[in-house]
Amino acid sequence: MEKQITINADDMICPHFDRVLFSHSLNKVLKGGRGSTKSSVISLQLVMDFLQDSHANVLVMRKVANTIELSVYEQIKWAIYMLHVDSLFEFKKSPYRIVDKRNGTAFYFSGVDDPQKLKSMVIAQGYVRYLWFEELAEFDSWQEVDMVRASFTRKHLPPGAHVVTYYSYNPPKNPYEWINEWVTQQEKLPGWYVDHSTYEDVTLPNILSQDYLDEINTVKANDYDYYRWMYLGEVIGLGNSIYNAELFHPLKEFPDDDDIMELYTGQDSGQQVSATTELCVALTRKKRVIVLNTYYYDPVGKVHKKAPSDIAKDLRDTEQRWIDKWGRHFYKQSADSATSDFALDHEMYKQYNQHYHHVAKTKKTKMIDNVQNLLATGRVYYLDTPENQIFIRQQRDYRWDEDTLQTDNPRVIKENDHTCDAFQYLVLDNLRDFDLKY
């Protein structure tokens, strides 16, 4: 005789979500701001539903497979432990699966790098009854998602059983992104339930820490539009200027009440074609991110342009001056992964046995989001020195191309943006150090 499991979910799922969870809709879209607990709610509901059907399987998907372990896999695992049913499961990582020891049904996890592969997925025990597309905005289009979804919804299930699909995401800023236009269409359709939640809907105690709420209020005070997007999940549009220039705080000198914990550099190189720049940035004990120095060489308009070997020597000498001035060696040196940047890297290695770390670039809008996120914390400073004027001027002048704003692929104006790129590579490469990734 199976032991009965008693679960009180009311202590874990905020009342806001009752309507979407108890809805009979087979497609449930949970969107909203960061900290709304929507992903936690879905994971708890999936585990509870899974336990009620001994033949049910769950397929959880992200766009890219290498994001699974530290996101949806751990999220489902967390829900299982929260519900005190971990003794029923075996946790596997190669491939990622969480298997019910009693009957062999499981939570399956997959990237959708190639939707065609999932179309031919076979489940040996039972049937796929629940789907979850997490971070839906990362997918390229609804067609990509629907190709996978339809592969499972078309299959015959026992009487009374249906495939239920969950979708969760934070809305992008751009109203012309496919997902923002798509959701307005889906919420009008029968069989669909669209829910929007924010951190303000988290009414149960001991879920959001006071430190997190303080962080939200800091962002709200520093950049209200960013707060509306990040934490309220509003589609605020892109505007024309990319950064709020007031969030780059000038300093006459390095603060007496703070200390450098680590030094970083960020580089964008164009060599003989366009400008090469490198930034020296400090992370301090008080979590400030301070741009200390800027190297900038622009060959445009010069008759005699520097060769890669000359730029390599410039950088080597400049970096040594920075090390001497600030009394620290660099913790990490980040650079673009473009061909020209590797050319400079090869020159540095040939002359000085030195390599840079070439970042795995994401979409431009995502790299910009990282910087905007950092700026919204109010922790970005720069030394107001002559050499840093090119840095602050380019950040202030950084613009979207107006001809691309009303599209799902907005582009920046690629002029005088080299320090912007260098700063983006540096931030992308150090998200965890800068408290932007947990």
Question: At which residue positions do the language-model features occur?
Answer:
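Walker B catalytic acidic pair
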Residues: 134-136
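Conserved Walker A/P-loop ATP-binding site and its immediately adjacent core
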Residues: 56-76
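Walker A/P-loop NTP-binding motif
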Residues: 39-53
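Pre-P-loop entry segment of helicase/translocase ATPase cores
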Residues: 1-27
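Mg2+-dependent endonuclease catalytic cores in nucleic-acid-processing enzymes, primarily RNase H-like
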Residues: 289-412, 431-434
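ATPase catalytic-site recognition across NTP-hydrolyzing enzymes
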Residues: 204-270
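ASCE P-loop NTPase helicase motor core
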Residues: 138-214
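Inter-Walker segment of RecA-like/P-loop motor cores
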Residues: 69-127
